[in-house]
């Protein structure tokens, strides 16, 4: 999803490359799309532009909270937004997401019915607003040799590696990074304590805050891209999204420096999170017609497979899976097994009061308060 060298190619190539080819854009056909950085194949946008004569203004983002703020403020300027299902559920309730016209989405039958059912159950009733794109989980990416060299008693495979202050103190000597994502870390911490990851009980957040305060001194950075620097031994332990763990492992192997990385996800019932990312159309979108065209295009099997092969994230497109590299589909970091998925939790839309409590817990954690 987030290999830094790819972002430059994507943002430049999607617009400049096509212009250099001398394409004349259809009059007034401009589509504004925002998505996580490095979360789409390099040629997906340019191929769409070439096929339909539509100019795409593609705007990568690196913070879910930032895109939420734009959407909630209104007049975001976007026609298509990539976002997490759990976040979209909140935006749907606020009237910020437009319902889909499924008569214009004949490729929707390619999406995995199990994922559609999960979405309808948890975040988008009747699948009225959201087109699934990728799905996955989170866990810990680590350098076993460096971990054991630094701390021979490290509990590899246990989330105590990142949530127990005694262990983390030792591992901090070789570098520990956390995702800069409260929507992942706070529920993960609740689950680690044996609490409901969707808890609405303030006492539970007090317990999480106390645990996080104890480990805060031993975290080097909060960075969603820290996994990219693990092959250089900047960190020995990082909480990551699963597919980024796979990217880190591959990057280390390609560097051929002797660094070997591995990944594990939280084990046990209700310990690991299942997330689903997808595409929505804001209610104030200026180009709804071409937004539907783009969503339908993204659900083509060959397009979905190309995106998955580039990002190494698990596509929600069932018909695309046979077209995806085996290195990706065979890795539990990218494609968790069905048995693992059965044990996972999904995050719920929490009452505003609890959301504020989560935000305060996260802010204090990062600040070391």
Range-by-range predicted roles:
Residues 338-369:
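Conserved C-terminal helix/tail region of periplasmic/extracytoplasmic solute-binding proteins
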Residues 98-109, 160, 255-273, 282-284:
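Short beta-strand->loop
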Residues 89-135, 154, 160-163:
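Hinge/lid segment of periplasmic solute-binding proteins
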Residues 277, 282-343:
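Mature extracytoplasmic/periplasmic domains
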Residues 1-12:
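Bacterial N-terminal signal peptides that target proteins for export
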Residues 27-91:
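Early extracytoplasmic/lumenal segment of secretory-pathway proteins
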Residues 20-26:
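Sec/Tat signal peptide C-region and signal peptidase I cleavage site
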Residues 174-189, 193-264:
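Ligand-binding pocket segment of bilobal, Venus flytrap-like solute-binding proteins
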């Amino acid at each position: 999803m987030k290999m830094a060298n790819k972002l430059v190619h994507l943002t430049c190539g999607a617009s400049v490359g096509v212009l250099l080819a001398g394409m004349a854009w259809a009059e007034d056909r401009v589509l504004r799309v925002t998505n996580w950085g490095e979360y789409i194949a390099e040629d997906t946008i340019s191929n769409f532009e070439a096929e339909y004569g539509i100019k795409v203004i593609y705007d990568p983002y690196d913070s879910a909270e930032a895109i939420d703020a734009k959407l909630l403020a209104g007049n975001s300027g976007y026609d298509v937004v990539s976002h997490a299902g759990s976040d979209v559920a909140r935006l749907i309730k606020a009237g910020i997401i437009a319902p889909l016209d499924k008569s214009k989405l004949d490729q929707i039958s390619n999406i995995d019915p199990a994922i559609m059912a999960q979405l309808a159950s948890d975040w988008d009733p009747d699948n009225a607003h959201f087109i699934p794109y990728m799905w996955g989980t989170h866990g810990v990416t680590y350098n076993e040799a460096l971990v054991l060299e630094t701390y021979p008693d490290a509990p590899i495979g246990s989330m105590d590696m990142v949530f127990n202050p005694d262990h983390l103190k030792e591992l901090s000597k070789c570098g520990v990074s956390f995702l800069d994502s409260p929507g992942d870390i706070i529920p993960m911490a609740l689950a680690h304590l044996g609490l409901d990851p969707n808890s609405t009980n303030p006492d539970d957040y007090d317990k999480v805050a106390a645990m996080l305060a104890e480990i805060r001194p031993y975290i080097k950075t909060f960075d969603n891209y820290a996994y990219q620097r693990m092959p250089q031994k900047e960190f020995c332990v990082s909480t990551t999204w699963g597919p980024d763990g796979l990217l880190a492992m591959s990057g280390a192997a390609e560097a051929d420096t002797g660094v070997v990385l591995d990944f594990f996800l939280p084990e046990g019932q209700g310990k690991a999170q299942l997330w689903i990312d997808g595409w929505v159309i804001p209610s104030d979108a200026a180009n709804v017609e071409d937004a539907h065209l783009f969503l339908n295009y993204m659900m083509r099997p060959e397009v979905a497979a190309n995106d998955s092969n580039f990002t190494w994230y698990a596509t929600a497109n069932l018909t695309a899976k046979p077209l995806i590299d085996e290195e990706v589909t065979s890795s539990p970091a990218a494609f968790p097994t069905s048995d693992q998925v059965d044990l996972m939790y999904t995050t719920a839309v929490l009452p505003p009061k609890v959301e504020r409590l989560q935000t305060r817990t996260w802010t204090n954690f990062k600040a070391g308060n």
